[in-house]
Amino acid sequence: MSDSNQKLIFAAVQMNSTAVLQENLDCARGFIEQAGAAGADIVVLPENFSLMSATGPQRRDAAERSDEVEAMLSRVARDQGVVIVGGSTPLPAADGRVTNTCLVFDRSGERIGRYDKMHLFDVSVSAEESYQESSYIAPGNSPLAVTTEGLTLGITICYDLRFPELYRYLGEAGAEIFTVPSAFTVPTGRAHWHTLLRARAVENLAWVIAPAQVGTHSGKRKTFGHSLIIDPWGDILAEHMGGPGVILAEVDRDRARKMRRQFPALQHKVLK
């Protein structure tokens, strides 16, 4: 943990998750421990940290073992004394699909929030690359803003990033930090990743912590990487350019509040 009460250290974990649940959990735990040893206060994992490029049976098996995922995150949050935003992991849905769910834990290991991804990636990136998340993921219907360490986090996942109204809603609910665990494709990442993340930071005067998946997953899908930590002015404080790893940034916990007072654009909107 950082020494000053005015300072916090954010950490974003970049992973190359596979279709093997236990390997991914071991990898995530190692990165959280690495971040904790470096003094991190808030650690954010990427989307699909526990399972990536899985078959239907593998997804269902992982969802049925979600208690193992939750137990690991709770234990390492308590052991390391860090807040964990748990990227996303599959949980069982009532209709036989799974949810793409982010679980949030405080320093004591208590689960303080659950967010199910609302916007599902049903797109054709190219003639050769298309996705239909709604065929196996049930969408959530409730945004989540959760307060811990005296700060409010707005929890989002990947494709949510393209819907600015969600971030404005979370900002109006008090969020000063947006977490955006992601698994962007390489083409969309090259074209839009940095632009979208900086825009969400600037237009809401909020921190953005955006951990990402990177590389080729189980010989199938390829993801962009480039995990980022961005300040409320849109400046990139840290970026992970390579493979799996951890980035950290020390920040002034009151910076977003100070900037919102000095540059009160959020109070100037005309359309409701």
Q: Where are each of the predicted segments found?
A:
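Cys-nucleophile CN-hydrolase/nitrilase-fold catalytic domain and related Cys-dependent amidase chemistry
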Residues: 21-22, 29-108, 114, 185-206
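Short, acidic/polar
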Residues: 23-32, 162-168
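Short, basic/aromatic-enriched C-terminal tail that caps enzymatic domains
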Residues: 248-250, 254-272
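Short beta-strand scaffold segments in enzyme catalytic cores
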Residues: 86-87, 101-104, 144-146, 227-229, ...
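Active-site catalytic loop in hydrolytic enzyme cores
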Residues: 93-173, 186-195, 258-265
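CN hydrolase (nitrilase-like) catalytic-core segments centered on the catalytic cysteine
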Residues: 65-85, 152, 158-247
